[in-house]
A protein has these predicted regions:
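Alpha-helical transmembrane segments
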Residues: 34-68
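Peri-transmembrane interface segments
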Residues: 42, 239-242, 254-287
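Short amphipathic beta-strand/extended segments in non-transmembrane regions
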Residues: 65-66, 83-144, 262
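Structural beta->alpha junctions
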Residues: 72-82, 113-117, 192-194, 228-236, ...
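Mid-to-C-terminal secondary-structure elements
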Residues: 129-144, 154-254
Length: 296
């Protein structure tokens, strides 16, 4: 027994004499383990959200806009690009061999209100066939607007899942009227809530209306893009074809650079993978430093 107490005493004396080293080793190991756990959890969570986003974008969709989807957003190089115009979509529909469906999509943030509640939401003005092109979500309550409602510029809207929760506290929103920028609109449909976010915005926080109605009530600047559908097998051919058609439609000379961007899920995936590598690299750096400090 005396020998046991003696060994314990020697151990405590050793710890006491090397307290700083033991302390740094413990702290270093703790930080290292904590960092690895946090980075692993973060990457896993991002992967799940990204999978939802990719589903919402669609692997058969092409998005034509003024700016590329990039985490390294260079606003100053893109801000003076000419707007995307509807007549350019007509060019694509006329000359493309790979595009099977298309829709104009106009975007604008506005103040939405219902009774004593208000929120800023994204308005989308689209064609009637946009409802058929939606991926990753669907109309789960009510319906999409019709060709006739589009032609007659009806004030009807389809709302994202979060709009129902925010304005109606889970109650059925169909038939209710929301004011957008002071103009009253009737809700005829509700989108399934996805929880996803894409470079084009969250479908949970969106209000969709006929593009004709959108253009009638909004004469100010809006952010426009084309949503084009093709076969997943032809996505790269379709992107290059659309790029060439857009150059003609925008009257660009051979030596001039593109003043528009042709985006798709694969480009977004590439950007996302680069971001994941950067996050993992930072985690490894912090872990490495902590292990060096701990003397391992």
């Amino acid at each position: 027994m005396n020998k046991l107490f003696k060994n314990i005493s020697i151990g405590f004396e050793s710890i006491k004499s090397n307290f700083t080293r033991v302390f740094l080793t413990s702290i270093g190991l703790t930080i290292g383990i904590f960092t690895v756990s946090i980075v692993t959890a973060a990457v896993s969570s991002i992967d799940k959200e990204f999978a939802k986003s990719i589903q919402s974008i669609g692997n058969d969709k092409i998005y034509v806009g003024r700016m590329p989807w990039s985490f390294e957003f260079d606003w100053w190089n893109y801000r003076n690009r000419p707007e995307i115009k509807e007549e350019q979509l007509e060019y694509i529909n006329q000359y493309s061999e790979f595009i099977t469906q298309s829709s104009m999509k106009q975007n604008y943030w506005t103040r939405a209100s219902y009774e004593n509640k208000a929120s800023w939401l994204q308005m989308n003005g689209v064609y009637p066939n946009y409802g058929e092109m939606l991926t990753g979500t669907k109309v789960v309550n009510g319906r999409f607007f019709s060709e006739n409602e589009w032609k007659l510029q009806r004030r009807v809207i389809i709302v994202g899942g979060s709009v129902r929760e925010g304005f109606f506290e889970g109650k059925n929103p169909l038939g209710k009227k929301i004011r957008l920028g002071g103009v009253s609109f009737e809700i005829i449909g509700e989108l399934e809530k996805t929880g996803s976010f894409t470079p084009t915005g969250s479908l949970d926080q969106v209000i969709i209306m006929p593009s004709t109605t959108f253009q009638r009530i909004l004469t100010r600047w809006t952010w426009n893009e084309f949503v084009l559908q093709t076969s997943p097998d032809n996505i790269n051919k379709a992107k290059e074809e659309v790029r060439l058609i857009m150059r003609v439609a925008r009257k660009l000379k051979p030596e001039q650079e593109d003043n528009f961007a042709v985006n798709s899920a694969d480009a977004f995936t590439k950007q996302f993978n680069q971001m994941k590598i950067a996050i993992a690299g930072m985690g490894l750096l912090v872990t490495g430093i902590s292990l060096i400090v701990s003397g391992i």
